[in-house]
Swiss-Prot record:
It comes from Lactococcus lactis subsp. lactis (strain IL1403) (Streptococcus lactis). This is 6,7-dimethyl-8-ribityllumazine synthase. Keywords: Riboflavin biosynthesis, Transferase. One of its GO terms (cellular component) is riboflavin synthase complex. One of its GO terms (biological process) is riboflavin biosynthetic process. It catalyses: (2S)-2-hydroxy-3-oxobutyl phosphate + 5-amino-6-(D-ribitylamino)uracil = 6,7-dimethyl-8-(1-D-ribityl)lumazine + phosphate + 2 H2O + H(+). InterPro entries: LS (IPR034964), LS/RS (IPR002180), LS/RS_sf (IPR036467). The active site is at 88 (proton donor).
Amino acid sequence: MTIIEGNLRTENAKYGIVVAQFNEFINAKLLSGALDALKRHGVQEEEIDIAWVPGAFEIPIIAQKMATSNKYEAIICLGTVIRGSTSHYDFVCNEVSKGIAHVSLNSNIPVMFGVLTTENIEQAIERAGTKAGNKGFEVAVGAIEMVDLMRKIG
């Protein structure tokens, strides 16, 4: 039996990050966490490209554009969708998650889901660097592991 796992090491890998502008005060913290994780694990600034999109709904199309450009070994998607008083939240969350999964499966590169889907602003703040950690950091660590794992599998 062979067990294959990704390690937290990457050399000469380029990462694309897609960040939503809507809820930017939270998403900027997610981005900061992601950049911190990448840099702590040896990724150089010139190996990172960041694309800002208007909102979470626009993340998949730019993730797809990046993924199919053959420039990146992983795409990190960051955004925040907070439940409001209408069903808009459910539609956005469902379509963004499906879109990101679709991009990953069709491009054959890791496209990491770092979109917070929360009931309220307090939950979003907690997940962007306070009591519940920083999901941007966690997703970037996952991206590094996935790049290494994909390389090992070939």
